[in-house]
Amino acid sequence: MSIINDIKERYKSGNIVEKLIYINLAIFIFMLLISVFQDLYKGEINWFVEWFSLDDSFSSLLTKPWTIITYGFLHADFPHILLNLITLYFIGNLFIEYFTQKQLLSFYLLGTFFGGLLYLLSHNYFPLFEGSSSLLVGASAGISAIFIGVTTYIPNYQLKIRFIGFVKLWYLAAIWVGLDILGLSSETNAGGHFAHLGGALFGFLYVNQASNKELNIWNIISSLFTIKKKVSRNSKMEQYF
């Protein structure tokens, strides 16, 4: 019980980045437990994934509208969640040096939403996806919104990467987006790459166009995380990655 209490305390005292990491990890562990029991009973599809991942059809979205957000908290396997959460940790903490914690949550959720929307549009428009069906999971669209959003705001910020040295943030963002563009022709995860680009596009357009950098639409949702008031501090000019 002491471990559980320790986790609860860490969650309560953590910033929004840490809270999102804990939530994603908890859901991933829950999914693994369901998969174990599903295998024991020879089930074909994990019911949790089926109900909370985003299907590629608009008709399915009408019956399960929550999935355009909830898919952003599910992950396919351990490497998938590991890469996403490592990126979220470093980029997310950089983001809240310049924006508020509520804004980070807004970018995560809205990036997930617009990523899911582009995923649906691409699957129902491009011939590449004809005759195929898929389910979308992963936090990458929301993380892409955060990554590209903060890059648009401070493109020349320099990250210190071990064994490499200082690298401008926009170089890393260009690689991040470039890999998704190259992946659009893939027959295995093209839909996922469209979702990532949808989140990235939202992050870029919003920061590029907004005059006050404020997002208020998700204030009610963000209040559920009981985030403490952000303490003013000087922004760091380098960060280990």
Could you say what each language-model-derived stretch is?
Residues I4-K8, L88-E97, I154-K160:
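C-terminal ends of transmembrane helices
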Residues S2, L32-I34, L94, T151-N156, ...:
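Structural signal for the C-terminal ends of transmembrane alpha-helices
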Residues Q103-L110, G138-S140, F163-Y171:
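Cytoplasmic-side transmembrane-helix entry/capping segments in multi-pass membrane proteins
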Residues S133-V150, F194-G198:
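Membrane-interface loop-to-helix entry segments
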Residues T112-F114, L169-G178:
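Small-residue-rich segments of transmembrane alpha-helices in multi-pass membrane proteins
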Residues M1-I16, L25, L179-F241:
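C-terminal transmembrane module of polytopic alpha-helical membrane proteins
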Residues E97-Y98, Y153-F166, S211-W218:
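Alpha-helical transmembrane bundle and helix-membrane interface signal
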Residues S13-L136, L182-A195, F204:
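N-terminal TM1-TM2 helical hairpin plus the immediately adjacent luminal interfacial "cap"
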